[in-house]
Each structure stands twice: as C-alpha cells, then as structure tokens.
Amino acid sequence: AVLTYFVGFNDSMIPESERYDAKETVKSVASSIENNEAVAMKFYSPADGNVVPLTEVSDQAFSSEALGKGIAVRPTNGTIVSPIAGTVSAVYPTAHAYGIKGNNNEEILVHIGIDTVKLEGKYFTPNVKTDDIVMPGDLLATIELDKIIEAGYDPTVMVIDTADSSKRNVTLLAKNTVHAKDDLVLIESI
C-alpha cells in the first residue's frame, strides 16, 4: 500500500496475470535471513551518470528509506538498464518504474525520476515486459532525458531493495561518475 501511494498506481491498473506479490518475496528473503542464510546483492549501475546517495534524493519516500535501502544515479543519457539478473515482475503502466525479482529471490524496484508518474508515460519507452528474463546491463527502458528535465522533473533513477531495510547494510562500490553496468552498491543482510 505504501508503494502504491508513493509511485502513484494501484493493482487494478496492472492485469491480474502481471501482478506479483512483493510481501511474499519479502517473507522469503526474511526467512533466509532468519535461517542464517547469507543474502548479499550487488546492484550494477542502471545508467550512465552521477551517483547520488539515496538519502539525498528529493523525494521523502525514497530518501527516508521507507521503501527500502538502495542507491540513486542522476542519468546523463536516456538509456536505463537492469541493475541485476532476474525476471521482470512488473512494468508500470507509465513505464517509469520496474519491479525485478532477482535470481536469489531478492525483489527490487527501479524507479525512474521523481514524481514522473505525473507524466503518464510521456517520454518513457519500456523495452521489457513482465516475465522477461534480464541480465545486468540489459535495456529496461529508454527515456527522453532532455524533455523530462524541460518538463520540470528530476530524472534521478533509484534502485531499491524492497526487503526490510532494518536488516540491511549498504556499501557503496562507486562514487561520483558511473557507466551503465558498473558495480554500484552491495547490500548485505545483517
């Protein structure tokens, strides 16, 4: 429900066959943690650009880490790629956000821009669909970066681990400038 409120959609906008149950995924990861199974995830950069700590993005839902821990990149071009290997679990109708279930059952959110849901898909072209298999660096979407900025929106791309953030440590693997698919962050269970 919190995710629905902040990213601006509801389940009725996604066909039943394309919905995923993030709560079940979070329970699965939490169970692994409780059983002392190590959970470590490396996120690769989703874009060429500048690294921004998640706590410094201009949207409180992300900067407070209420949606989970992660990292952000302010893109310098319109190519957005997958930061992990996995299966696309959701492509939002406005093409500004993507859910990916990783090969180790991690569930991540790739959210393109701040309040860009208000663009209603304008300037976003999805290049994947639900149930597609992706590898780090595979094209998720192309965006018209200049037009998003001209429309007054911050195009920062957030990559969020949606599991219980109180049980996660984040280690930055890159600072300043990155290229798509560069090592970006390591998130480990504690």
Q: Can you name each region flagged by the protein language model?
A:
Residues 4-190:
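Contiguous, well-folded functional domains in the mature portion of proteins
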